[in-house]
């Protein structure tokens, strides 16, 4: 396995999934996500961009206040495959000044071996096995929902985005995905920090 310490899904005997949200927090979308999660009694994990936490500390504080777990998604949403290791690690460390978590998810799911090796002793790299593609302009909300229905399995780590780019599809797909998953016997867990 390329990155044996990396978590792609968390297999379980009973039906459970891990909802995760990347790229926030932002005041235009994240509070709505929090309200949806509260409505359904769900705890999730938010992989936050440090610069968004810096700009919107009250939104980040609300994520924590409502009992969700958080992870580091770099300071500036850097794509690891095109950035040198030293710069990438510095960006992660800068974000850590705003985000107190040992969880890390590389933006775009891309990280080089040397970058992963540099952080593996201090951080747990959490990827995903189901990306909803809610950010895609080529998909509508129904297609995003279909991605969840088609690809979910026990222990899936599901990625949505609390971002402006994903907002339209997210607002359609998230409540419907939650309801469908509940109807099909899934429970929801945050990724332990």
Stretch-by-stretch model annotation:
Residues 32, 91, 173:
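Charged catalytic carboxylate motif
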Residues 148-192:
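Catalytic grooves of carbohydrate-active enzymes
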């Amino acid at each position: 396995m390329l990155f044996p310490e990396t978590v792609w899904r968390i297999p379980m005997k009973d039906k459970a999934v891990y909802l995760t949200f990347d790229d926030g927090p932002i005041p235009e979308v994240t509070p709505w996500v929090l309200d949806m999660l509260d409505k359904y009694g769900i705890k999730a994990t938010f992989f936050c961009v440090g610069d968004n936490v810096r700009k919107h500390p009250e939104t980040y504080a609300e994520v924590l206040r409502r009992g969700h777990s958080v992870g580091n998604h770099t300071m500036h949403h850097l794509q690891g495959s095109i950035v040198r290791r030293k710069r990438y690690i510095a960006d992660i460390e800068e974000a850590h000044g705003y985000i107190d978590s040992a969880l890390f998810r590389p933006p775009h799911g891309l990280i080089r071996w040397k970058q992963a090796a540099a952080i593996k002793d201090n951080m747990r790299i959490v990827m995903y096995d189901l990306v909803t593609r809610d950010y895609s302009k080529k998909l509508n909300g129904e297609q995003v929902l279909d991605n969840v229905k088609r690809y979910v399995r026990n222990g899936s780590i599901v990625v949505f985005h609390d971002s402006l780019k994903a907002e339209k599809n997210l607002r359609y797909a998230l409540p419907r995905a939650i309801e469908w998953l509940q109807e099909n016997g899934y429970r929801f867990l945050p990724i332990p920090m």
